[in-house]
Swiss-Prot record:
One GO CC annotation: mitochondrial intermembrane space
Residues modified to N-acetylalanine: 1
Keywords assigned by UniProt, alphabetized: Acetylation, Electron transport, Heme, Iron, Metal-binding, Methylation, Mitochondrion, Respiratory chain, Transport
Post-translational modification: Binds 1 heme c group covalently per subunit.
Record organism: Guizotia abyssinica (Niger)
Disulfide bonding pattern of the chain: none
Residue numbers binding heme c: 22, 25-26, 88
Residues modified to N6,N6,N6-trimethyllysine: 80, 94
Family indicated by similarity: Belongs to the cytochrome c family.
Record-level Gene Ontology MF annotations: electron transfer activity; heme binding; metal ion binding
Name of the protein: Cytochrome c
Lineage top rank: taxon: Eukaryota
Subcellular location: Mitochondrion intermembrane space
Function: Electron carrier protein. The oxidized form of the cytochrome c heme group can accept an electron from the heme group of the cytochrome c1 subunit of cytochrome reductase. Cytochrome c then transfers this electron to the cytochrome oxidase complex, the final protein carrier in the mitochondrial electron-transport chain.
Amino acid sequence: ASFAEAPAGDAKAGEKIFKTKCAZCHTVZKGAGHKQGPNLNGLFGRQSGTTAGYSYSAANKNKAVAWZZBSLYDYLLNPKKYIPGTKMVFPGLKKPZZRADLIAYLKASTA
């Protein structure tokens, strides 16, 4: 199923998902440093593997995907399948509503 078929995202629910599943490795605040994963500020419209100052895997650089709702929705289902060789160890979010919620939060918090 695609992002277009997903339930409407709830940014508040997405914030809880981010804090419990993503914040250990990622930040969203403008100017915040990188952790184990890159800072996600400015994520939408950016090409994978291009955040300044973060050491990406060759897989992320070579995938050259533009991060938008559709690509993130597919990526977050199974990151290692979407970008084989990625350094991201997170196994993914299987529930469509969780992915939609997280994307709603990321859209609001990384702009």
